[in-house]
Swiss-Prot record:
It comes from Clostridium botulinum (strain Okra / Type B1). An essential GTPase that binds both GDP and GTP, with rapid nucleotide exchange. Plays a role in 16S rRNA processing and 30S ribosomal subunit biogenesis and possibly also in cell cycle regulation and energy metabolism. This is GTPase Era. Residues 37-41 are annotated as: G2. Pfam families: KH_2, MMR_HSR1. PROSITE patterns: G_ERA (PS51713), KH_TYPE_2 (PS50823). Residues 58-61 are annotated as: G3.
Amino acid sequence: MFKSGFVTIVGRPNVGKSTLLNAIMKEKLSIVSCRPQTTRNNIQTILTEDNYQLVFVDTPGIHKPKHKLGEYMVKSASDAMKDVDLVLFLINPDEKPGRGDLFIIEQLKEVKVPVFLVLNKIDENPQEKVAETLKTYSELMEFEEIIPISALKGKNIDLLKELMFKYIPEGPQYYPEDMIIDQNERFIVAEIVREKALRLLSEEVPHGIAVEILQMKKNEKGTYHIEGNILCEKNSHKPIIIGKGGSKLKKISQYARQDIEAFLQSKVYIRLWVKVKEEWRDNQSLLKELGYKKMK
């Protein structure tokens, strides 16, 4: 008997959805940063074992949109809860249910598939706090399963996999067993660069950063030559991203190259520039060029 199903991970921004997905896959597949709203596209990730295949949809965190990109991110997360077989609602025990959580719960009450409540970061919180959070959420909605985990340390991840297998239906293998992600290499490379920029820039530059890959070629020796732009919204952000004498941009390139080489399993040369695109997050045509679906 072979089972297969689509699983959506939902939760507030910065709750650890991408970290959970990476823990399940044991690979760095989805951009992980300490800053909220770092996942911008639904990333379908495929886990294939001997007797099942799970297709995970890692979504942007649900939040009140402030621009066209924000609208896209929220719509993307909401759409991901439709036509799936299982939903994982990820929360942190140290945070009381906020408006974002209540908004998600109202949506979850409408879905016709099993919903798991997954408590992340249990290693960082006392048992009393975890129990209190469990009680609070259980009173808001009935969940098929409640699983405490630590995505960062991998605690109870195998248990979570076992429970997901229990609930998904019998079905075909949708993707080849050696395929782990349905996004192309260029998309992943852009996300790696963006993650490094977010980490190194800290609070100096807000979320108005995007990455466009201009060129990605592989020579006869198997070496990739990559060129790209880091887009920012204000002229004042450009020197911050570049840094004194180009130091910040050099670090972004260096750290990105290391992860890109691990991802592509090849030597990589990368050149990055910084380009100002004012209000790019409200530019529908540019958002489309960067890979974001058109808003209806």
